[in-house]
Amino acid sequence: MSGFYRAAATLSARFLHVPPVAESIYAHRSVATGEISFGRSDIDLLMIVRQPRGDAADGPELASLYGRLCWLRRFNPALSHVEVHDPAGIRRWLELDTYRSSQERRSAMLLRGKPVCFPDVAVRREDAVRRLCVWTEGFFSTAVRERNRRNLRKTALEIWCAFATAMGRIPQPCLTRPEIAARWAESEDAPLLDPLLRDPSTAPSVVFRLAKRLHGSLLPPLRPVSQPLVAQLLMPPRYRQRILVVVPEENSSLPREAFQPGSCLCTPELLDLYLHYMNPFLVWSCPQQLTGLGVQPPSVAEFVRGCLFYGHNHTLRNPGFMYRHTWPPAVFIEVVRHALPYLHAGEIPPPLDPRRVAGWIAGSPSPCEYYRSVFPHVYRESEEQWIQLQELEERLRSS
């Protein structure tokens, strides 16, 4: 079945490879590793486009490329995510996220164009912790909400892989879930695996237990909470409506809010990891009750890393290629514009007034309009912000 998917990916790459704009196209993730479930797996591509040129920053060319992708998706609906980088951006991303870099270096399959150099670097612990947070916030909560047994098992395996990498039990992330399961079965966490494989509904308990172990190795212990905490919030930095559901511990019953649209399910320990290793901006809208548990605010360095992670320039090309929303890039430019003066002064940025981004969210353009009219401006400002953020990170590291 992997041969069928790879053939479909190759044909898609041939259609999308439009020189001189599109320079390289890779298959990555499940198609590249051969871990295919027919009718369920998506075709995910990694595309390198040329370095943006002129005042338009290749916005019209990206709009045209998006149009080709829309046409192609009519015939190949499995073609879901196309992650688009420019040459300078892919180098930055591979240096910024060594976890993903390790996986791409060992599995990405060139389908069209010239090869990219994937650096062979050690996986940083902080990148593995952040990847665990990405899986829990972005995918695990969705699997719980949908009661999707396959995705509960899948995300729990990926979370253990990130956990084991962060704990130093494996030197680099596994590439397939059978490999993860085999390594897990050999580890000291093996007693958690059998219940998960027999009954994926135990995944929340397993994930929360792993998060507590990881938290204990990285951050001060938190005071216990007696009952679930539920809060509706506009979650920065992308300002999407979410329901934050914090359950006391790994064996807690899940409240009904955990199954509602937009839920974000966690324990206090998992939320603390998320705040310090992935999304420091959450402190702007975090319920006050959490500070009573001993959750500490993120540092200036953690805010800088958060800006670099969320503000990498490939996210400017997410609209249409990765996700349907077109407003997040401009919103995050506004977030960084607000934060930079405080970070330069060595201060934690205060909360951004949501009214400053409300206009972007309300007036979301179509992807073609975004690339022709908005992208050139956000691209130029993003590049200027990136230079400042890198200088800040180097200064903080040297001090």
Model-derived features: positions:
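Conserved NTP/Mg2+-binding pocket subregion across the NTase superfamily
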Residues: M1-A7, L62-A162, S205-Y323
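Helical scaffold of the NTase/Pol beta-like nucleotidyltransferase catalytic core
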Residues: M1-Y26, S399
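Short cationic amphipathic helices and targeting signals
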Residues: L45-M47, V245, E257, C264, ...
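Extended, basic/helix-rich recognition subdomains
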Residues: N148-R198, H338, G346
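Hydrophobic alpha-helical positions that pack around
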Residues: A330-E334
